[in-house]
A protein has these predicted regions:
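Periplasmic-binding protein-like
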Residues: 1-3, 102-139, 164
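Short helices/loops that flank or line small-molecule/ion binding pockets
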Residues: 70-94, 99-100
């Protein structure tokens, strides 16, 4: 899956420019040096790398939003100019923006430096005989699924610029997994 990143409105791109390194945002520097708040879904894990940065963020650097529609509400706050930067998972942001009738070309996504372009998903179960058996069966199933079709379905949610790279990276990933 595409990694989490920061999204801004096109008109607010300059907010991130001082923190860009090779097209990626230095999130630690942004949180430490700016009076602008970053909108986050409260109590969500963004992965170990980003979570560590968020836990070290200065007081008041984040605007956490709670509830089932937290991301949609953050995007609405952004659209109204109350918030300039939102942290999230790009396909989810694209979907929620579409639902809120925010045109995709109004938003610009920036990856976070050091986070990695793609994320692996994980399944966890309780550490019991049944849980270990479930994980074993899930792992076996994942190795034999027809990934090509699933990868195409996922890629359809990505912006056109990311689709080809994702499909190539996913193909290589699953080939490596099958060889193990």
């Amino acid at each position: 899956a595409v990694g989490n990143g920061l999204v801004v409105r096109q008109q607010d791109r300059s907010v991130l420019e001082p923190y860009l390194v090779d097209g990626e945002v230095d999130l630690s520097a942004l949180l430490a040096a700016t009076d602008r708040k970053v909108g986050v879904v409260a109590e969500r894990s963004y992965g170990e790398f980003i979570d560590n940065i968020l836990h070290q963020a200065p007081s008041g650097a984040l605007t956490p939003h709670y509830g089932n529609d937290a991301l949609t509400n953050l995007l609405s706050m952004q659209r109204l100019g109350r918030l300039q930067v939102v942290l999230g998972y790009w396909p989810e942001i694209r979907y929620q923006a579409r639902q809120a009738q925010i045109a995709e070309n109004e938003l610009e996504f920036y990856p976070i430096r050091g986070n990695g372009k793609y994320l692996s998903g994980y399944v966890a179960c309780s550490d019991t005989t049944q849980g270990r058996q479930a994980i074993s069966e899930i792992n076996q199933l994942l190795r034999t699924l027809p990934h090509e079709h699933l990868n195409q379905l996922y890629a359809a949610w990505l912006d056109p610029e990311r689709q080809a790279d994702y499909l190539e990276q996913a193909r290589a990933f699953f080939e490596r997994q099958a060889a193990q």
